[in-house]
Amino acid sequence: MNLNINSDISKAETLPSSFYKDLESFKIIKNKIFLRAWHWVGDENLIAEKNSLYPFTLLEGFLDEPLLLSRSTDNNIKCLSNVCTHRGNLLLLKPCKSAKIRCMYHGRRFKSDGKFEFMPDFEKTKNFPRNCDNLNSFLVKSWNKLLFTAFNPIVDIEKVLDIMDKRIGFLPLNKAIFDSSLSQNFKIDAHWALYCDNYLEGFHVPFVHKDLSEVLDYNSYETEIYDHCNLQIGYSNKKEDCFIFPKNHIDYGKNIAAYYFWIFPNIMFNFYPWGISINVVKPINLKFTEVKFRSYVFDKTKLNKGASSDLNKVEKEDEFVVQNVQKGINSAFYKSGRYSATKEKGVHHFHYLLSKFLNS
């Protein structure tokens, strides 16, 4: 499917309804976008000690890529393929501590950095070992103890994190602790991009989120667009339950209750005075999506206040409208719409990037 989203939002039309129903586009997105995206995979506590090994599946049910986080004796963190280079067996099935990675199938052994080390009964095998006998090693970025990985990224993660740091660098994120009580997975009967569409605009807040709209100043709501990320700034009607900025901060003197950062294509970082809620949107099929919420808290006294007073309620309200849109786009009479040039900058940005990389 060839998509053409005009770069001028005042002239552009939204993604056609056919995009959300096209299986071929869904498959192409996997290879052209998700396999080339940066992915948030957790935090350093997954491999807190030296010689820690942590196997996981990246975007299970969609990418289904077996990976392995490794922390060596010199505290070097790696993200490796969890697939043995001999016959394709999964190397590890559960977290463990070991200075070596050993395949349980035929005994092939690797160092913690993924380099091939030993294979029994291969003395007569010619031209062995080769570079391809090492485990594939992927890019890793640690930011405030949060871990990201990528294979062949189209996004410059350093630029994105620098943009985020300019706004939230003053927060003690390195002291934030994972809170399982505020973390869960949501299953939504809708296309993954519809969920992102909804997240990327505050236009719907007065109509869908009555309680949240009493906290946020709708008329002051802002969206800032960058290359591969964007930021929505949630201003408050009052000073209570807002960030306390240092004097040299770009937003010093403003009543800001939340920063909502989105990284193309599917990661949301929601910053509040108490900490951060990270949302990862995982496509499953054309009509089903899973969204992972993970929260890290550095100030419990500020929980359940302001713009984050009831995140679960807001999520359910969002799911309700997104699932209604999923039903609506199946209409034979809806093709596409237009953007509000002032209120839907984030949605347009998302659609433009999708079209850019799908057409590349």
PLM feature segments, named:
Residues 1-19, 176-178:
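Short, contiguous pre-domain boundary segments
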Residues 41, 91, 116, 212, ...:
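Short clusters of hydrophobic/aromatic residues that line enzyme substrate/ligand-binding pockets
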Residues 36-41, 48-50, 119-124, 261-265:
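Short Pro/Gly-enriched beta-strand edge/turn motifs at strand-loop
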Residues 17-62, 68:
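Non-catalytic accessory segments flanking enzyme active sites
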Residues 47-153, 158, 165:
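Rieske [2Fe-2S] iron-sulfur-binding domain
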Residues 76, 82, 141, 146-360:
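C-terminal catalytic domain of Rieske-type non-heme iron oxygenases
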Residues 34-38, 89, 204:
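Generic structural signal for secondary-structure transition and capping sites
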